[in-house]
Amino acid sequence: MEHADIIKKTISFVKETLKDAEGGHDWYHIERVYNNAKNIAETEDADLLVVELAALLHDIADPKFNNGDENIGPQLAAEFLNSIGVDPAIITHIQNIIRYMSFKSSFDAPTFSSLEMQIVQDADRLDAMGAIGIARAFNYGGHKGRAIYDPNIKPEAHTNKEAYKNSTAPTINHFYEKLLLLKDKMNTETGMRLAQQRHNFMLVYLDQFYRECYQ
């Protein structure tokens, strides 16, 4: 099957699978990450098919919405890719990207890395920053019933994956526990440049947020 046909079938599969997904992890999130990844890949010597498929499938079954099970996503991706005849080596590569690209995985010693994963990781992290990242953070916080802000609950410097996953802190804390840390975790030059712009916007937002809280 040709590259374009594989991508077309994958887009249809992802749209159908995520049609009822939470707003910050729906098809439109996938589409933004997909476009980010293609943009970053233009300046990198990467396997574009792997980049595109991993970007499209990276949240096909996010553990946050599957009782923390980190195996469902890679398994579902493999089953679909097998069904359309994708090369087994490519499938394994994509499974590894899905399994190890998340922010929470950064708390563990790296067990897998590739240029393609770095590109998709940057693309996904960009969508957690800037105006879109702010909107997604509050959308997810509302979905989980979390407070917007509580000055009595201070941000924590999480040192392990379980502490990060189990946090129920107000959404503003999430800026300090993840979003503002992403700029320094980017892998590619393009990712770093785009991240700086979005990072700066979040700082402006927080400044205005506190002004309105305490004016």
Whereabouts are the PLM-identified features?
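Hydrophobic, well-structured mid-protein blocks that either form specific transmembrane helices
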Residues: 85-121
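Short alpha-helical hairpin
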Residues: 1-15
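Conserved strand-to-helix beginnings and helix N-cap segments that scaffold or border functional pockets
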Residues: 66-70, 131-132
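His-Asp-centered metal-binding catalytic motifs of divalent-metal-dependent phosphohydrolases/nucleases
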Residues: 48-65, 73, 94-104
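An active-site-proximal "capping" alpha-helix that borders the catalytic cofactor pocket
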Residues: 33, 69-83
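Short, well-structured alpha-helical segments
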Residues: 27-34, 52, 91-102, 203
